[in-house]
Regions:
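Nucleotidyltransferase catalytic core that binds NTPs
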Residues: 1-137
């Protein structure tokens, strides 16, 4: 079975996460590189939920075979260790603070012929938008 790597924060579970996991699972066994609290804070904000709590949630998802820590925004350490056939990430990282991480993933995957799959970001669904909705209620 092919292997698939998905790096993510998954602070507040939403439809967009499920969409990514569904696409990833269709390609093979999914390992989630769950960004540590420090990794998340390095490019946006402190997560609402601690890493161990997010790991418990993500581990319960049927599409996910394994959850490992991703200690930085740079995926390459985990990718070189796992050498996945595919990396799946929403297309929201083409520009912005994750653009250099994206390019590093592309370069790393080229070392063994891995493929980056970038499904369209789920419109109107994000942890940031959920936080804003909660603040307004």
């Amino acid at each position: 079975m092919p292997s698939v790597y998905v790096g993510m924060v998954c602070d507040l579970l939403h439809e967009g996460h499920i969409n990514v996991w569904t696409i990833a699972h269709a390609k093979g066994d999914v390992t989630v590189g769950l960004l540590t609290d420090e990794a998340v804070e390095s490019y946006k904000r402190r997560p609402i939920q601690a890493w161990k709590d997010r790991k418990t949630i993500v581990s319960a998802i049927r599409y996910v075979k394994d959850v490992i820590p991703q200690p930085t925004l740079d995926y390459t350490e985990n990718l070189r260790a796992l050498k996945p056939d595919f990396v799946v990430h929403g297309n929201d990282w083409v520009t912005g603070p994750q653009a250099s991480a994206r390019q590093a993933v592309i370069d790393c995957l080229a070392e063994w012929g891995g493929v980056l799959i970038e499904p369209a970001y789920t419109d109107g669904v994000s942890t940031t938008s959920l936080i804003e909705k909660i603040k307004c209620t």
